[in-house]
C-alpha cells in the first residue's frame, strides 16, 4: 500500500515557520488514506516507515523560510524563502541554489527551503479550492479535475526523487565561452520525497486514445504568463509511451517532504518525472493535452537543448537547430561533484593531520532510473584511479529503477594530497556511461558533466608549518572565485601582455597584476575618477567619460561598483573588447589572513595556519525611505504597473506607480531611464523616455511600441523588452534605474551637454519611430513655460501614417502654439489624401522645414542609426551645421 505521512491540515508549520503562502491551503479532506491492493495494482508497496524516516530526517533541522528583503517590490514579495539561497539572476525572477556545503550537511533528503529553484517569471498565487487541472486533446472524456478530486479519486505514489536543473555546473561552461544561460554552480540539484497521482491513471480515466488515432504526445502546461516567444505559457511534452509507462513513476505531485508544495515548487500541483531534467517537470500545472505533435510552447523548443558546439545563436535561428528533435534533453546524464574539500578549505599539514587519512566526499547521479555503480577519483590527471565507497540510501522501485543521487567517499593520505595538483572525479552507471574528461561547450550550457576538478595549492608557511588550500572550478552566480576564473584572467592578461609567462607551479594570476579591494574601488565614483568592476577586473573609465555614446551618466551611475550584470546586459562584444583598454588591475577576491581574523574553513579542526578569507554573498542594499525624488542613480527602484492602454495594434501606454505616491520621478528633461528585467534567465536593460511630464507626482507614463515576433523578417524574435512589457499583468513590478543621458534641457533655450552649457533660440528636431519620445519630452517642457520662446521645428519619420506616435498631441501643439512649434511628417508609404512628405528624410525636406544653421540654432535627433547616419548627419552638414558641436544625439 502507498505510504502515508500522518494527518495534517495544509496550512502548516513548515520547518519552524508558519507557511500560509498568501492563500487558502486547506483541502476538504485529510491527505492520509490507505488504498487496497485492488485499486493500486500498478503501484509499489512502499515501506511507510522508510518514507516517514526520510521525511523526519529532512525536517529535523530547521531551515527557516522568511520574507526576504530582496523580494520587496517584486511580484514575489509574498513568498517566503531561505535567506541563504544563492540568487543567480538578481532579485527577480527567483532562480537560486543552496550553498553547496549547506546542501550536503542535510544529506540524502533536502529541506524544502534549500531545494534549488528555477522560475521563469513571478510565482502564481494559487488557491487549493479553486485550482483545476484540465485534461483535454485526444481523449474520449475531457475532464477538469479539482484538487480535491485528484486527491480523493486516485491512488497515490510516494517516493524520493532527485531533481536536477539541466544547467547544473553551467558556470564552468561560461568560463570557457559565454553561453546564453545564467551561472548555475554545482548545487543545482536536490532530493525530496514526492507524493502525487500517477499520470497514467488520470489519462486512462479520461480515455486517452491510441497511437493509431494520433495520440503520440502528452503536453503539460503551467499557469504562468511568460514573455518568451512574444508571450506564452511554460509548457513541454513527453511521448505517450513515457507517460503511460508504470516503471517511470510519473506523477502529478501535490506534496513534498510530507507537506503541501511550497509556492516556489509549484503549489498546488506540479509534474514529477523522475530521472528527467527539471525543465520537463512543469510547475503550477493547469492543462494536460494529448496531441499528435510535440508541445508548441516557446519553452519546449527554445530551452533545454544540447546543440553541437559550433552552433551559435545566429546559426541556431537561421538553420532551425532549435526544432531538430535529436537535440532535446529528457533524461539526465551521468554526473558527479566533489563537495569535500569545500572551496577555499585549508588543510593544515602537521604531525596530527598526517597520521590519519583525509576523506574526500561528493555526490553522483544519473538519469532514466540507471543506478550509479562506480565512482572513481584520480590524483594524477587520470593516469590511475581509486574506486570510492558508495552510499545508496534509496530503495529501488519494483522495476529496479533508481531515482536519487548517491554519495561517495574516499580516504586519501594527506601526503598524497600534498604531492598532487588536482583531485578529479568521474562516475559510472549501470549502462556503463561515464563522464568525459574535458568540457564540451554548447550554446545553452546544458548537461555539463566533465570530470569535476578541485585544484590544490600549498599555502605560504606560517610559524614553520604549511597547509593545502583547495579550490573548486567556480562559484555560483556572479560570486567571484574558482580556479577557472583565475586561469581565464591569466589567459586574458597574457593576450593583452604577451611578455607575461604563466606560472608552472600555480594557476593563480601573475602577482605583477595590480590588485584592488572593493572598498578602494568605491572611492572612485566621481567624474574626476570613475572606476568600475566587470568580471573581477577593475577599469578606470575616467578618460572615456566624454566619449561614451550614452553620456557620462551611463558610466557615473555605476562608478565605484561591480556592474558586471548591467554591463553585459547592454553592451556588444565590440564594446567589451574596447573596455580592455581601460583595465588597471584585478579585484581582490581572496587573501591570506591570520587565524584570529578569519573563520576556520577546514573540516579537520582548528589550526594556527593562515586561512583564506571566505567569499561572502553580496547582500542587497536596503531600499531608501520614501523621499521627494524616486530615482536613485545607484539603485534600481521597483515600480508597479497600474494601467496598460492599447493605443493601436502594437502601441501601448503603460503607467507605473512609484514606491511612494508623493514622489516625483526625478528625471531631468532630456534624460532617460533604464527598465531592467530578467528575461529567460538573463538581465535585459533598455532605455526609455517617459511621455508624462517631469512634474507628475506618484507615477510616470511610457509609450511603448511592441515589436512582436515574426513580424519583421530581419528581427524574427521581435523586441525582447517590449514583448516582456506586453506580457506584464497589472500589479507586476519592474525595476527602474536612472537618470541616464548626456543631454539635459534646463529651460528657456539652455542645455547642458556633457557638463557644458549650450544655448539655442531655434531647435531643429528630427525623430524616427519611437525616437519621438525624447523630442516630445523637451517640447513638452518648453511649451509648459509661457516665457520660454524657443522655436521648435520637428521632422518626424515613420513607415506608415498609422505608425506615428503622439500625433494627436503634436498636432494640437502645432495648432495652439504655431509660432513656437511646427511639425512635418514623413512616411515611406502613404494613403490617398496624405498631406505631408513621402519617402525618406531628404535634404530638400530638411531645408524647407528646419531652421538654417546659425550661432543660435541647435539640431537634435533620436531614431534608428541608419536614419541618423545616412540622412540626418550628411544633410545637416550640407545645410551648414557643425554636426560635431551643434547636433545632439539622444
Swiss-Prot record:
Alphabetical list of CDD domains matching this protein: cyt_b5_reduct_like (cd06183), eukary_NR_Moco (cd02112)
Record-listed FAD binding positions: 686-689, 703-708, 715, 720-722, 773
Enzyme type, top EC level: oxidoreductase
Domain FAD-binding FR-type: 634-746
Co-factor(s): FAD; heme; Mo-molybdopterin
InterPro entries from the UniProt entry: Cbr1-like_FAD-bd_dom, Cyt_B5-like_heme/steroid-bd, Cyt_B5-like_heme/steroid_sf, Cyt_B5_heme-BS, FAD-bd_FR_type, Flavoprot_Pyr_Nucl_cyt_Rdtase, FNR_nucleotide-bd, Ig_E-set
Entry EC number(s): 1.7.1.1
Cofactor: binding details: Binds 1 FAD.
Record Pfam families: Cyt-b5, FAD_binding_6, Mo-co_dimer, NAD_binding_1, Oxidored_molyb
Tagged with keyword Heme: yes
Domain Cytochrome b5 heme-binding stretches: 513-588
Gene3D superfamilies: 2.60.40.650, Cytochrome b5-like heme/steroid binding domain, Nucleotide-binding domain of ferredoxin-NADP reductase (FNR) module, Oxidoreductase, molybdopterin-binding domain, Translation factors
Binding positions (heme): 548, 571
UniProt similarity note: Belongs to the nitrate reductase family.
The protein's role, per its UniProt record: Nitrate reductase is a key enzyme involved in the first step of nitrate assimilation in plants, fungi and bacteria.
Subunit field text: Homodimer.
Name assigned to this protein: Nitrate reductase [NADH] 2
Organism: Phaseolus vulgaris (Kidney bean)
Amino acid at each position: 500500500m502507498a505510504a502515508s505521512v500522518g494527518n495534517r491540515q495544509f496550512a502548516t508549520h513548515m520547518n519552524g515557520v508558519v507557511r500560509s503562502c498568501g492563500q487558502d491551503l486547506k483541502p476538504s479532506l485529510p491527505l492520509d488514506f490507505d488504498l487496497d491492493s485492488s485499486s493500486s495494482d500498478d503501484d509499489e508497496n512502499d515501506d511507510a516507515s522508510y518514507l516517514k524516516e526520510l521525511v523526519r530526517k529532512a525536517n529535523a533541522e530547521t531551515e527557516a523560510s522568511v520574507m526576504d528583503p530582496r523580494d520587496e517590490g517584486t511580484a514575489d514579495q509574498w513568498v517566503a524563502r531561505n535567506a541563504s539561497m544563492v540568487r543567480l539572476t538578481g532579485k527577480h525572477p527567483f532562480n537560486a541554489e543552496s550553498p553547496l556545503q549547506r546542501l550536503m550537511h542535510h544529506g540524502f533528503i533536502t529541506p524544502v527551503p534549500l531545494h534549488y529553484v528555477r522560475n521563469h517569471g513571478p510565482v502564481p498565487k494559487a488557491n487549493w479550492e479553486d485550482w483545476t487541472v484540465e485534461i483535454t486533446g485526444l481523449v474520449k472524456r475531457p475532464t477538469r479535475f479539482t484538487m480535491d478530486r485528484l486527491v480523493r479519486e486516485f491512488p497515490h505514489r510516494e517516493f524520493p526523487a532527485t531533481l536536477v536543473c539541466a544547467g547544473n555546473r553551467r558556470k564552468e561552461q561560461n568560463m570557457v565561452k559565454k553561453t546564453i544561460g545564467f551561472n548555475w554552480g554545482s548545487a543545482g540539484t536536490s532530493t525530496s520525497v514526492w507524493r502525487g497521482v500517477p499520470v497514467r491513471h488520470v489519462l486512462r480515466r479520461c480515455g486517452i486514445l491510441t497511437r493509431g488515432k494520433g495520440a503520440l504526445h502528452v503536453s503539460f502546461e503551467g499557469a504562468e504568463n511568460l514573455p518568451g516567444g512574444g508571450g506564452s505559457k511554460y509548457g513541454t511534452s513527453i511521448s505517450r509511451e513515457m507517460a503511460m509507462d508504470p516503471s517511470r513513476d510519473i506523477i502529478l505531485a501535490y506534496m513534498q517532504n510530507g507537506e503541501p508544495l511550497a509556492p516556489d515548487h509549484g503549489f498546488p500541483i506540479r509534474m514529477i518525472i523522475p530521472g528527467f531534467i527539471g525543465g520537463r517537470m512543469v510547475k503550477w500545472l493547469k492543462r494536460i493535452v494529448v496531441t499528435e505533435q510535440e508541445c508548441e510552447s516557446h519553452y519546449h523548443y527554445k530551452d533545454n537543448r544540447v546543440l553541437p558546439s559550433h552552433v551559435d545563436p545566429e546559426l541556431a535561428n537561421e538553420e532551425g537547430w532549435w526544432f531538430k528533435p535529436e537535440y532535446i534533453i529528457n533524461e539526465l546524464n551521468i554526473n558527479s561533484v566533489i563537495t569535500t574539500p569545500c572551496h577555499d578549505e585549508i588543510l593544515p599539514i602537521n604531525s596530527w593531520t598526517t597520521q590519519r587519512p583525509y576523506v574526500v566526499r561528493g555526490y553522483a547521479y544519473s538519469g532514466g532510473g540507471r543506478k550509479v555503480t562506480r565512482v572513481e577519483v584520480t590524483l594524477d590527471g587520470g593516469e590511475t584511479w581509486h574506486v570510492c565507497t558508495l552510499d545508496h540510501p534509496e530503495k529501488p522501485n519494483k522495476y529496479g529503477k533508481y531515482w536519487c543521487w548517491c554519495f561517495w567517499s574516499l580516504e586519501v593520505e594527506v601526503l598524497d594530497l600534498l604531492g598532487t595538483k588536482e583531485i578529479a572525479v568521474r562516475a559510472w552507471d549501470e549502462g556503463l556511461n561515464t563522464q568525459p574528461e574535458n568540457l564540451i561547450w554548447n550554446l545553452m550550457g546544458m548537461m555539463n558533466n566533465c570530470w569535476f576538478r578541485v585544484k590544490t595549492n600549498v599555502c605560504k608557511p606560517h610559524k614553520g608549518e604549511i597547509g593545502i588550500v583547495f579550490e573548486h572550478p567556480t562559484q555560483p552566480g556572479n560570486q567571484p572565485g574558482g580556479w577557472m576564473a583565475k586561469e581565464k584572467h591569466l589567459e586574458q592578461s597574457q593576450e593583452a601582455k604577451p611578455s607575461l609567462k604563466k606560472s608552472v607551479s600555480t594557476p593563480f594570476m601573475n602577482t605583477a597584476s595590480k590588485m584592488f579591494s572593493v572598498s578602494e574601488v568605491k572611492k572612485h565614483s566621481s567624474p574626476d575618477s570613475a572606476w568600475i568592476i566587470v568580471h573581477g577586473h577593475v577599469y578606470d573609465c575616467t578618460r572615456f567619460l566624454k566619449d561614451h555614446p550614452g553620456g557620462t551618466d551611463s558610466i557615473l551611475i555605476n562608478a565605484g561598483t561591480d556592474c558586471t550584470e548591467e554591463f553585459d546586459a547592454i553592451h556588444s562584444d565590440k564594446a567589451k573588447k574596447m573596455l580592455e583598454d581601460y583595465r588597471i588591475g584585478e579585484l581582490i577576491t581572496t587573501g591570506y589572513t591570520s587565524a584570529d581574523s578569519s573563520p576556520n574553513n577546514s573540516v579537520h579542526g582548528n589550526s594556527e595556519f593562515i586561512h583564506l578569507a571566505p567569499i561572502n554573498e553580496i547582500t542587497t542594499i536596503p531600499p531608501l525611505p520614501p523621499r521627494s525624488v524616486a530615482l536613485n542613480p545607484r539603485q534600481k527602484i521597483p515600480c508597479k504597473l497600474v494601467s496598460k492602454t492599447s493605443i493601436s495594434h502594437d502601441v501601448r501606454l503603460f503607467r507605473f506607480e512609484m514606491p511612494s505616491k508623493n514622489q516625483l520621478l526625478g528625471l531631468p528633461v532630456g534624460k532617460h531611464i533604464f527598465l531592467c528585467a530578467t528575461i529567460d534567465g538573463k538581465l535585459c536593460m533598455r532605455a526609455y523616455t517617459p511621455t508624462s511630464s517631469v512634474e507628475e507626482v506618484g507615477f510616470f507614463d511610457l509609450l511603448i511600441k511592441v515589436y512582436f515576433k515574426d513580424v519583421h523578417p530581419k528581427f524574427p524574435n521581435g523586441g525582447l523588452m517590449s514583448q516582456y512589457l506586453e506580457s506584464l499583468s497589472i500589479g507586476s513590478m519592474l525595476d527602474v534605474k536612472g537618470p541616464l543621458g548626456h543631454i539635459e534641457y534646463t529651460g528657456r533655450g539652455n542645455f547642458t551637454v556633457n557638463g557644458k552649457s549650450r544655448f539655442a533660440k531655434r531647435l531643429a528636431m528630427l525623430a524616427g519611430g519611437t525616437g519621438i519620445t525624447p523630442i516630445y519630452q523637451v517640447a513638452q517642457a518648453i511649451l509648459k513655460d509661457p516665457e520660454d520662446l524657443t522655436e521648435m521645428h520637428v521632422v518626424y519619420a515613420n513607415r506608415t501614417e498609422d505608425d506615428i506616435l503622439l500625433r494627436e498631441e503634436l498636432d494640437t501643439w502645432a495648432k495652439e502654439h504655431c509660432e513656437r512649434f511646427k511639425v512635418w511628417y514623413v512616411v515611406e508609404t502613404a494613403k490617398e489624401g496624405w498631406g505631408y512628405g513621402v519617402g525618406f528624410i531628404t535634404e530638400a525636406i530638411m531645408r524647407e522645414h528646419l531652421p538654417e544653421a546659425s550661432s543660435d540654432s541647435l539640431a537634435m535627433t533620436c531614431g534608428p542609426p541608419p536614419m541618423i547616419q545616412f540622412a540626418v548627419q550628411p544633410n545637416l552638414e550640407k545645410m551648414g551645421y557643425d554636426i560635431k558641436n551643434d547636433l545632439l544625439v539622444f
